[in-house]
Amino acid sequence: MPDIRPHYFIGVPIPEGIANPIYQAAKNEPILTFQKWVHPLDYHITLIFLGAADETQIKKLEGSLAEIASEIDPFSIKFGKIDVFGDRRKPRVLHLEPKKNKTLDRLREHTKQAVLQAGFQVEKRPYHPHMTLARKWTGEDGFPAHVPFESGEVSMMAERFSLFQIHLNQSPKYEEIFKFQLS
């Protein structure tokens, strides 16, 4: 029987003023032929995917996340290259990568420890921070070696991270349930 509990993740939301221009530039680039484009209000950098959870588990995690937020100052995130996950001939995911960022890595590690202590499982795959832009390549040729789309010097201040609930049949589909202001 499928688990009907809501699904959640923890992530850093991308401000609308950053998300909208990225969305327009990527979606209007003719060589980026993907079937499903992520709504710009859903742009985020995932820290941890939690999966199905009940209210008790979420409440248990909330206090730990608030404590983490009080220990980390707001920080700048600079975005680098656009890239894909999956076979380059038919990639699954188009994403924008943030440049290496020690504070983002620290936030992820602290969040991971809190999630484990709250009894959640954490994916064993290596962590690759990214902002998903689109899914399901539809091009006839593979993903190009050079993409003229440039994020330029796109940067943002990460002033909070959030616990998101996923609503699969809505658009936008991610709802910020709890916001944790960095201090």
Swiss-Prot record:
Active site residues per record: 44, 130
Keywords, alphabetical: Hydrolase
Domain of life (superkingdom): Bacteria
Sequence motif HXTX 1, location on chain: 44-47
Catalytic activity: a 3'-end 2',3'-cyclophospho-ribonucleotide-RNA + H2O = a 3'-end 2'-phospho-ribonucleotide-RNA + H(+)
MF GO annotations: 2',3'-cyclic-nucleotide 3'-phosphodiesterase activity; protein kinase A regulatory subunit binding; RNA 2',3'-cyclic 3'-phosphodiesterase activity
Entry EC no(s): 3.1.4.58
Disulfide bonds, paired cysteine numbers: none
Motif residue range(s): HXTX 2: 130-133
Coiled-coil stretches noted in the UniProt entry, renumbered to this chain: none
Main enzyme class: hydrolase
Signal sequence extent: none
A cellular component term, taken from the record's GO annotations: cytosol
Family matches, as InterPro entries: Cyclic_Pdiesterase, RNA_CPDase
Its job: Hydrolyzes RNA 2',3'-cyclic phosphodiester to an RNA 2'-phosphomonoester.
Record HAMAP family: RNA_CPDase
Sequence similarity: Belongs to the 2H phosphoesterase superfamily. ThpR family.
Protein name: RNA 2',3'-cyclic phosphodiesterase
Lineage: Bacteria, Bacillati, Bacillota, Bacilli, Bacillales
